[in-house]
Amino acid sequence: MSIKRLSMRLKKGIHRSWNRMTSLEAGLEEEKEIKIVEEPEPRPWKVLITGGAGHLAENLVAKLEEMTRDSIRPKIREMLEKEMPAVISTKVDKEVEKRLPMYIQIVLVDVLEPRGRVLKHHVAFVKCSFDDECTMKTALEQVDTVYHLAAVGMTGQYARDRKACMDINAVGTMNLLIWARNSGVQRFIYTSSVGVVFSGEPMYNATEEVGYPDDFYNYYCESKAHAERIVQKASGHRMRTTVLRFNGIYGPGEKRVTERVVKFMLTGMWIATCKPNGVEAQTQLSSVANCIQGLVKAELALRWSDTPHGQIYNIMDKTPVGTFSFWTPLNIALGFSSSMITVPATPIRLFAYLSQIIADRMRIDPIVSVLEVDLLLVNNTFNIEKAERDLGYEPSVSAIPEIIEHYLHRLPPDVVRPKGRSDFYVKVAVLVLGTILIFVAVFSFTFWMYLIFQRLSRWNPF
């Protein structure tokens, strides 16, 4: 074999070896890239929500999902652009949903089952009370954040049972804090009510420093006040806590306040307002959207070591509103007149007292409670500067436009704007007659009780 041919073979061999090395390096690079893409993500953020069947919990789950999707979508998009740029638009959302459980897992706890649409591959449901030790200890495993939204006694059988309210709302919360801390939970957010500080006296721009009253309106408020103190004292290095106070939660689809108002408006009897001493009382409600913002931002703030913890924050709408006039745009949108008569506060309060007395005797929920009426008739406005400063809270002014849109799209047209709604004065007559009947009933009851006690005081069987 000639030197020339040997040289050519050697060059071909070197060239083939170089090609193999290049291919091998490219393969290794590709394998390395794939390995980076497919390497396991950090442990997902695990959240536990008590009161998980409620409207607030449902909206909180939706917000946490939205936040997680927004955070991982850019990463998924970047990954898919390298692999399959032609189908990127159809693939991203599907891939985000597929990978969602890798980034967030939610556990809902309640004695009632949530709506089916809430439960997904990353949302689990545990049917139990939050004071069930065995079940809760299991549910709390590997949980990072607890949102404690549940409580009893606002209505229902527990409203008349002080021991049950204290055992569940106060002692139950204390036990939940202990189990959470022992399980490694890092952040604990507790939801409370302005009822814990409202005593029936006017409150103007009240801060979180307002003290607790000597006497509470009901067992619910008393037990929540005790729970607030417990949550504050439990805050420390291992687990940081925050208390959020709400006032009259309302919003599209919310049942306790909003749907009660809508149902009453649809009867056509939303025709009166009340102005004690000639001035309508002012309040600050808490829209669902603002509540969710407060919950999310409180959790995020607790992640930073320089953020105060063990604090109480007022979470309300941005500005005070009239307790009755606030709802007027909704009443008009439902097709009713804007005309209103002004009624005195006394018959409204009498109705609330009678309603609550009858409800307590019959062991049912009152049509309207004394606390609810006083919150309508007495000024109660709150300062939200602390939440704005510490949490970055940026509340909206009102959710009334969203509520109007929600119900106008869901109620049948003949219900929203039926004909023959010009009977305003007939309704006024009915209202006046009802007020007179209440006065007569109260007077008759008082008179007969007086006669009975007089006879008993004179009776001597000996």
Curated annotation (Swiss-Prot):
What domain of life does the native source organism fall in? Eukaryota
Pathway(s): Steroid hormone biosynthesis; dafachronic acid biosynthesis
UniProt: NAD(+) binding residues: G51, G52, A53, G54, H55, L56, Y220, K224
What Pfam families does the entry give?
A: 3Beta_HSD
Q: Which reaction does it catalyse?
A: a 3beta-hydroxy-Delta(5)-steroid + NAD(+) = a 3-oxo-Delta(5)-steroid + NADH + H(+); cholesterol + NAD(+) = cholest-5-en-3-one + NADH + H(+); a 3-oxo-Delta(5)-steroid = a 3-oxo-Delta(4)-steroid; cholest-5-en-3-one = cholest-4-en-3-one
- Its GO biological process terms? cholesterol metabolic process; nematode larval development; sterol biosynthetic process
A GO term, aspect molecular function: oxidoreductase activity, acting on the CH-OH group of donors, NAD or NADP as acceptor
Q: Name the Enzyme Commission number(s) assigned to this protein.
A: 1.1.1.145, 5.3.3.1
Phenotype when the gene is knocked out: Mutants are hypersensitive to pheromone induction and form dauers more readily than the wild-type.
Which residues span the membrane?
321-341, 428-448
Q: Where in the cell is it found?
A: Membrane
Q: What does this protein do?
A: Hydroxysteroid dehydrogenase involved in the biosynthesis of dafrachonic acids. Catalyzes the dehydrogenation of cholesterol or its derivatives and the isomerization of the double carbon bond on the sterol ring. Modifies sterols into a Delta(4)-3-keto-sterols such as cholest-4-en-3-one, precursor of Delta(4)-dafachronic acid. Contributes to the production of Delta(7)-dafachronic acid in the XXX cells. Dafachronic acids act as ligands and bind directly to the nuclear hormone receptor (NHR) daf-12 suppressing dauer formation and inducing reproductive growth.
Can you name this protein? 3beta-hydroxysteroid dehydrogenase/Delta(5)-Delta(4) isomerase 1
Recall the taxonomic lineage recorded for the source organism.
Eukaryota, Metazoa, Ecdysozoa, Nematoda, Chromadorea
